Amino acid sequence: MVLCFPLLLLLLVLWGPVCLLHAWPKHLTRAHWFEIQHIQPSPLQCNRAMSGINNYTQHCKHQNTFRHDSFQNVAAVCDLLSIICKNRQHNCHQSSKPVNMTDCRLTSGKYPQCRHSAAAQYKFFIIACDPPQKSDPPYKLVPVHLDSIL
C-alpha cells in the first residue's frame, strides 16, 4: 500500500496538464467554445486570432485550425452520416467538400506574448457533434470538437 501512494501522486501530476489541454471555459458551452476556437468567417492574422483563444486559457496554444465559414455551414456537417471518432465514439461527421482554413502554429513567446505562424489550407475536416445545450443555436446537433483535418 505504501508504494501505491507515490504512484498515484505521479499519475495525478502527469494527468493534470493533459486535462488542461482539453478543458474549455466553463461559462461557455462546448459549441460556443468550438466556434471561438475553430470558426473565423474571414481570415485573420494568426497572432490576432489566437490571442482571443489564449486569453481564455491563459497560455499559448501550440496549434489551432480556423475554418473560414459560418457556424451554420459547419453545423450542417453534423447532419451528415456519422462516423467513428479518434476516441472511438460514434458522433463524428466528415465534411462533404473541402473548405478554406488557416492553420496557426506557435513559433515563440510565452503567454501573453504568443507568436504564431499561419499556413493556408483547403481541406476536408471531421468534427464531433452533440445535442445542443440551452444557450446553443437550435440545431439538432452542434459541433463541439475538431477531430481531424484530411
Swiss-Prot record:
Site (Facilitates cleavage of polynucleotide substrates) location in chain: H59
Molecular function GO labels: endonuclease activity; nucleic acid binding; RNA nuclease activity
Chief location category: secreted
InterPro entries linked: RNaseA, RNaseA-like_dom_sf, RNaseA_AS, RNaseA_domain
Keyword S-adenosyl-L-methionine: no
UniProt EC number: 3.1.27.-
Residues annotated as site: Critical for catalytic activity: K61
UniProt binding sites for substrate: K61, H62, Q63, N64, T65, K86, R105
Enzyme class: hydrolase
Any single GO CC term annotated in Swiss-Prot or TrEMBL for this entry: lysosome
Residues forming the catalytic site: H38 (proton acceptor), H145 (proton donor)
SMART domains given in the database record: RNAse_Pc
Pfam family for this entry, one: RnaseA
Coiled coil: none
Disulfide linkage: C46-C104, C60-C114, C78-C129, C85-C92
GO biological process: antibacterial humoral response; antimicrobial humoral immune response mediated by antimicrobial peptide; defense response to Gram-negative bacterium; defense response to Gram-positive bacterium; innate immune response
Hydrolase listed as a keyword: yes
Residues glycosylated per entry: N55, N100
Organism superkingdom: Eukaryota
Localization terms from the record: Secreted; Lysosome; Cytoplasmic granule
Keywords tagged on the record: Antibiotic, Antimicrobial, Disulfide bond, Endonuclease, Glycoprotein, Hydrolase, Lysosome, Nuclease, Secreted, Signal
Family from the record: Belongs to the pancreatic ribonuclease family.
Record's subunit section: Interacts (via N-terminus) with bacterial lipopolysaccharide (LPS).
Protein name in the entry: Ribonuclease K6
